[in-house]
């Protein structure tokens, strides 16, 4: 607090036109006065500035943005291509198998009535001979169709080999996403000055409140070199904080 004598001296200096002496008196009074608000602001500014400098030196974020994310995009495109190729092969094989299975079913249905007559002993000799010839043809057909079915089923099985490779790729992409999430949490911590648990509450604020806060903000300084109340480089920030004793 300023004393009465100091106030009188300051008024007298101003009345006498002693501006330099008045400025020195005010400066001495200011230096001797503890300002907790200023101290707190300076401490927070220094912590934020150091955190930002450390964040700028984090080369991992640059690597992720430059290499990992494009690489992950290519991997996901590869997974899509392999999955689409396997699906097409599987559907083509099924399309080939269905007519074969239907044809076998129809042939068996044609033989079934005469076979039932044979089993009940009600078939004539001529019909029995005809049945034997039809069964012989059916066996030849079944042999060829079963070979075709086996080949198509093998094709379906081989088409599923993409799952092992694509599964590894997807797991790597998930790992990258988790790392990016962690880095974003660090960024939020730097800019909000809060613990991760407190950020959840910040992120869950109503949208209208966020819009109001953003509309009240001044925004970035576009031309700091034209303003006397702004700094334009990291060195000037360091000098400013050092001059304030932080």
UniProtKB/Swiss-Prot annotation:
Stretch list, region Disordered: 204-246
Any single Gene Ontology cellular-component annotation: bacterial-type flagellum
GO BP field: archaeal or bacterial-type flagellum-dependent cell motility; chemotaxis; regulation of chemotaxis
EC category: hydrolase
Family: Belongs to the CheZ family.
PANTHER family attached to this UniProt entry: PROTEIN PHOSPHATASE CHEZ
Name of the protein this chain belongs to: Protein phosphatase CheZ
Organism this protein belongs to: Vibrio parahaemolyticus serotype O3:K6 (strain RIMD 2210633)
């Amino acid at each position: 607090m300023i004393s009465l004598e100091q106030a009188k001296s300051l008024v007298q200096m101003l009345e006498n036109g002693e501006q330099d002496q008045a400025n020195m008196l005010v400066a001495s009074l200011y230096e001797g006065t503890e300002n907790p608000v200023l101290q707190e602001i300076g401490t927070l500014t220094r912590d934020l500035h150091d955190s930002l400098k450390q964040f700028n030196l984090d080369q991992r974020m640059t690597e992720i943005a430059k290499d990992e994310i494009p690489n992950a995009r290519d991997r996901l495109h590869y997974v899509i291509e392999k999955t689409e190729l396997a699906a097409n092969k599987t559907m083509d094989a099924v399309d080939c198998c269905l007519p074969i299975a239907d044809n076998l079913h129809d042939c068996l249905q044609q033989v079934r009535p005469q076979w039932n007559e044979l089993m009940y002993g009600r078939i004539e000799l001529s019909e029995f001979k005809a049945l034997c010839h039809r069964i012989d043809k059916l066996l030849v057909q079944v042999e060829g169709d079963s070979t075709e079915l086996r080949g198509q089923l093998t094709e379906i099985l081989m088409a599923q080999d993409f799952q092992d490779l694509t599964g590894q790729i997807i797991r790597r992409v998930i790992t990258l996403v988790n790392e990016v999430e962690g880095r974003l949490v660090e960024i939020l911590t730097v800019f909000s000055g809060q613990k991760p648990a407190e950020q959840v509450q910040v992120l869950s604020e109503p949208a209208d409140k966020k819009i109001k806060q953003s509309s009240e903000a001044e925004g970035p300084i576009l031309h700091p070199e034209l303003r006397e109340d702004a700094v334009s480089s990291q060195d000037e920030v360091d000098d400013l904080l050092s001059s304030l004793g932080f």
